[in-house]
């Protein structure tokens, strides 16, 4: 069972490294964030079933809902940036502009 936990931890770490390395493009950052959320979801589900913690069994589903909302908002932002600027560079994204 520890090999599964190690693989999921490595998947999370690689996705985090992907966010840090490919942070210039929004699409790459969103894909790496989804990888992080998916590995957290699987790891949390395995830990809850392994330790039989039924009191927090809804937590992975809540994480999955928030990651779906994050993906929807990220893709909407990506479409808006692409129609406005023609590319997905994060440097074009300025939160001070309305």
Swiss-Prot record:
<comment type="function">
    <text>Core subunit of the mitochondrial membrane respiratory chain NADH dehydrogenase (Complex I) which catalyzes electron transfer from NADH through the respiratory chain, using ubiquinone as an electron acceptor. Part of the enzyme membrane arm which is embedded in the lipid bilayer and involved in proton translocation.</text>
</comment>
<dbReference type="Pfam" id="PF00420">
    <property type="entry name" value="Oxidored_q2"/>
</dbReference>
<dbReference type="GO" id="GO:0045271">
    <property type="term" value="C:respiratory chain complex I"/>
</dbReference>
<keyword id="KW-0679">Respiratory chain</keyword>
<keyword id="KW-0496">Mitochondrion</keyword>
<keyword id="KW-0813">Transport</keyword>
<dbReference type="GO" id="GO:0008137">
    <property type="term" value="F:NADH dehydrogenase (ubiquinone) activity"/>
</dbReference>
<keyword id="KW-0830">Ubiquinone</keyword>
<feature type="transmembrane region" description="Helical">
    <location>
        <begin position="1"/>
        <end position="21"/>
    </location>
</feature>
<dbReference type="GO" id="GO:0042773">
    <property type="term" value="P:ATP synthesis coupled electron transport"/>
</dbReference>
<feature type="transmembrane region" description="Helical">
    <location>
        <begin position="59"/>
        <end position="79"/>
    </location>
</feature>
<comment type="subunit">
    <text>Core subunit of respiratory chain NADH dehydrogenase (Complex I) which is composed of 45 different subunits.</text>
</comment>
<dbReference type="GO" id="GO:0005743">
    <property type="term" value="C:mitochondrial inner membrane"/>
</dbReference>
<keyword id="KW-1278">Translocase</keyword>
<dbReference type="InterPro" id="IPR001133">
    <property type="entry name" value="NADH_UbQ_OxRdtase_chain4L/K"/>
</dbReference>
<dbReference type="InterPro" id="IPR039428">
    <property type="entry name" value="NUOK/Mnh_C1-like"/>
</dbReference>
<keyword id="KW-0472">Membrane</keyword>
<protein>
    <recommendedName>
        <fullName>NADH-ubiquinone oxidoreductase chain 4L</fullName>
        <ecNumber>7.1.1.2</ecNumber>
    </recommendedName>
</protein>
<keyword id="KW-0812">Transmembrane</keyword>
<keyword id="KW-0999">Mitochondrion inner membrane</keyword>
<comment type="similarity">
    <text>Belongs to the complex I subunit 4L family.</text>
</comment>
<keyword id="KW-0249">Electron transport</keyword>
<feature type="transmembrane region" description="Helical">
    <location>
        <begin position="29"/>
        <end position="49"/>
    </location>
</feature>
<keyword id="KW-0520">NAD</keyword>
<keyword id="KW-1133">Transmembrane helix</keyword>
């Amino acid at each position: 069972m520890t090999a599964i936990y190690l693989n999921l931890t490595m998947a999370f770490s690689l996705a985090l490294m992907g966010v840090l390395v490919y942070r210039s493009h929004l699409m790459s950052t969103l894909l790496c964030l989804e990888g992080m959320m998916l590995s957290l979801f699987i790891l949390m589900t395995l830990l809850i079933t392994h330790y039989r913690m039924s009191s927090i069994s809804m937590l992975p589903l809540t994480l999955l809902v928030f990651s779906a909302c994050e993906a929807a908002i990220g893709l909407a932002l990506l479409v808006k940036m692409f129609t406005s600027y023609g590319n997905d560079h994060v440097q074009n994204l300025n939160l001070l502009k309305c």
